[in-house]
Regions:
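Short catalytic micro-motifs in class I SAM-dependent methyltransferases
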Residues: 101-102
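Class I SAM-dependent methyltransferase SAM/SAH-binding core
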Residues: 34-88
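Class I SAM-dependent methyltransferase Rossmann-like catalytic core
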Residues: 2-14
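Conserved alpha-helix/loop element of class I SAM-dependent methyltransferases that forms part
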Residues: 14-33, 48
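Conserved Class I S-adenosyl-L-methionine
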Residues: 42-44, 163-261, 265-270
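A conserved beta-strand element that flanks and buttresses the S-adenosyl-L-methionine
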Residues: 98
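Helix-to-beta-strand junctions that scaffold the AdoMet/dcAdoMet cofactor pocket
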Residues: 106-107, 120-122
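Conserved catalytic/acceptor-binding region of the Class I
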Residues: 110, 117, 125-193
Length: 277
């Protein structure tokens, strides 16, 4: 996806960062040598990974030049690649491929995940988080506003069904490809501030390509049509804040490590017997 607005996206930096950190905390790798973050955005997580594993070559990958301009100064010990993650391939087999809130932009997850797992070194890990809120009022209102205006012909080709499958589908696929799979869902009740904050949240992600497809005045009129609907769906609380429930899917899939050579096992066994004599 192109046309990202870093300032709009970062209006809600903390609630967007929380699931990314929770995914990273579940990655159990002591000293990976090659680490990639796909869809690194402004590089917040790439920076954290470079600090966690200072001996690794950590590379952030994104196709947005605007996002990467923000990322480059943030982690001088990280590398950056401007590439489309739909066609990306690593320069070396990866010990960790990490992706937070990016793969749902891509189709055909069966083919995609097979390809990414194929890029892992033995014992390597694929760690992914994707939103699963596409049937929520925040997204239903997008489709409703799109159909209710002269902009429909421009927007219709950009609308599609939920890109993220049911959790069991991912569990079955990943279990057939990997030695171990850890999969879970979390629903976050995000407390947002500001005027119509759910509209502002969505404008930083899912709404962005639709707005980019329209010229004025249609762009503003479509945004206003969506804003009215989403404001009704998410009214403010008595204290002025707004609650946005948000469901997210996580998984960590690990390839089997290389088998220990039989000669190594025999040597270890002889050493153990000698030590006990």
């Amino acid at each position: 996806m192109t046309g990202w607005d870093p300032a709009q996206y970062l209006k809600f930096a903390q609630p967007r960062l929380r699931p990314a950190l929770e995914l990273l905390a579940r990655v159990q790798l002591d000293a990976p040598a090659v680490v990639y973050e796909l869809g690194c955005g402004t590089g917040a997580l790439t920076t954290i990974m470079a600090e966690r594993w200072p001996g690794a070559v950590v590379t952030g990958v994104d196709d947005s030049s605007d996002m990467l301009q923000r990322a480059v100064p943030s982690a001088p010990n990280a590398r950056w690649q401007r590439k489309d993650i739909a066609t990306w391939a690593p320069e070396a087999a990866a010990d960790l491929i990490y992706s937070n809130a990016a793969l749902h932009w891509l189709p055909d997850h069966g083919q995609l995940l097979r390809r990414l797992i194929g890029y892992l070194a033995p014992g390597g890990v694929l760690a992914v988080q994707m939103p699963r809120n596409f049937s929520a009022p925040s997204h239903v209102a997008i489709a409703e506003a799109a159909r209710d205006g002269p902009w429909w012909a421009r927007i219709e080709p950009l609308l599609h069904e939920s890109p993220v499958a049911e959790p069991r589908w991912y569990l079955d696929l990943l279990s057939s490809l990997c030695a171990s799979v850890d999969l879970w869902q979390t629903e976050y009740f995000q407390i947002l501030s500001g005027e119509n904050p759910v509209k502002e949240w969505t404008k930083g992600t899912w709404l962005q390509p639709l707005l980019a497809a329209l010229a004025e005045p249609a762009r503003t009129e479509f945004e206003e049509a969506y804003a009215r609907r989403v404001a009704r769906a998410y009214p403010p609380r008595a204290d002025g804040t707004t609650v946005l429930p948000f469901l997210r899917l996580f998984f960590i899939a690990s390839r089997a490590p290389l088998p220990v050579p039989a000669t190594t096992l025999r040597r270890a066994g002889r050493a153990g017997r000698a030590g006990g004599a």
